[in-house]
Amino acid sequence: MTSALEAIRYKRGHLLIIDQLLLPHVTRFIPIRSAEDGWHSIKEMHVRGAPAIAIVAMLSLAVEMSGLVSQQKISKNAEDTRVYIEEKLDYLATSRPTAVNLSDSVRKMKSVLEQKTRTLTCSGEEIAMSFIAYAENMLVHDVADNRSIGEHGANWIVANTPSGVEDSKLCILTHCNTGSLATAGYGTALGIIRHLHEKSQLCHAYCTETRPYNQGARLTAYELVSDQIPATLITDSMAGQLLAKMGQSIAAIVVGADRVASNGDTANKIGTYTLAVLAKYHGVKFVVAAPRTTIDMGTRTGKDIVIEERPHSEVTTITGPRERGDECGNIVMENIKIAADGINVWNPAFDVTPAALIDAIVTEKGVEVKDANGRFHLGSLFETEVRPSN
């Protein structure tokens, strides 16, 4: 089974992304015609999820470059074209600072462009086409990587949890949105849930609402319902009671990641750290699922990760459709105040879960666990790194 949801629609020169701010009530696609469009779609959270952010950023610039090529507006000079692309990449990298996938993609793309430019016979158009091909390959590779993550993670949970060994079907708790809407397709943590469901090994999935942006309630619940996966939505503050009630009947808490430090400390959606503490207390496995591009070997620990802070209004207001539409039956979206005027607000978008609270980190290459001294060795994941062809 493959998820029917398609959040990114791309063909060369054309990019559409689903507007996640309107989900689950309205399904509408936004055309992305330039790097500037891509930057705004990421910054304003029309698209979110670390893998999807990187892909949309690259494809937005690919669309822009395709237009310049077709209009014959590309400089004939390879170096000029490389500089133009790199300036656009640096601009796109400022849209969301915490998610490492974007900065990692920018770094790798710059390396590819530099190597390509060294070819004396290379033209500006060839540099542009090389970039476009690289961006397109990212889209293809991400889907394949997600399916591998789903399989590796599901198999590890089945083999390493009491309910996995003893029962034929498992219950999983997840946080935020890590599915088709957060990636090129299938998902990371939600990909594990999908794989268990495909193999008839999933009893039930639980998803948190994920305040303040409600990605769990709006997006993960939307995906679970769409794929007919048995699931229940809970508020963030109910997770402790769920674990107290069900104990190790919850096989694992599975989350994604926006940045993983070299020691395994993981930055993810706010509330992840709380779930990890709860998992430790209740003896439930805590699993991080992310592609290798999310692992930042240049960041030593979680203390070095910059945490993005979002607008106060995301906490003090909530947006949704009226229960009844207008006189013609059309959906009417409204922004509602839910907090006292004048109250101070702190709104970090992410928190950092220490590696000590994480049982396993799942990537497309397999499952990483800690050694006898309680340390992850994530560097081994990059010993045979394969980049998308250009």
UniProtKB/Swiss-Prot annotation:
Signal sequence segment: none
Name the record gives this protein: Methylthioribose-1-phosphate isomerase
Residue positions of the active site: 258 (proton donor)
GO cellular component: cytoplasm; nucleus
InterPro entries: IF-2B-related, IF-M1Pi, IF_2B-like_C, Initiation_fac_2B_a/b/d, M1Pi_N, NagB/RpiA_transferase-like
Keyword Nucleus: yes
Keywords associated with the record: Amino-acid biosynthesis, Cytoplasm, Isomerase, Methionine biosynthesis, Nucleus
Location in or out of the cell: Cytoplasm; Nucleus
Function: Catalyzes the interconversion of methylthioribose-1-phosphate (MTR-1-P) into methylthioribulose-1-phosphate (MTRu-1-P).
Pfam families, per database record: IF-2B
Known catalytic reactions: 5-(methylsulfanyl)-alpha-D-ribose 1-phosphate = 5-(methylsulfanyl)-D-ribulose 1-phosphate
Entry similarity comment: Belongs to the eIF-2B alpha/beta/delta subunits family. MtnA subfamily.
Residues of the site described as Transition state stabilizer: 176
Pathway: Amino-acid biosynthesis; L-methionine biosynthesis via salvage pathway; L-methionine from S-methyl-5-thio-alpha-D-ribose 1-phosphate: step 1/6
Any one GO molecular function term: S-methyl-5-thioribose-1-phosphate isomerase activity
GO biological process, one term: L-methionine salvage from methylthioadenosine
EC number: 5.3.1.23
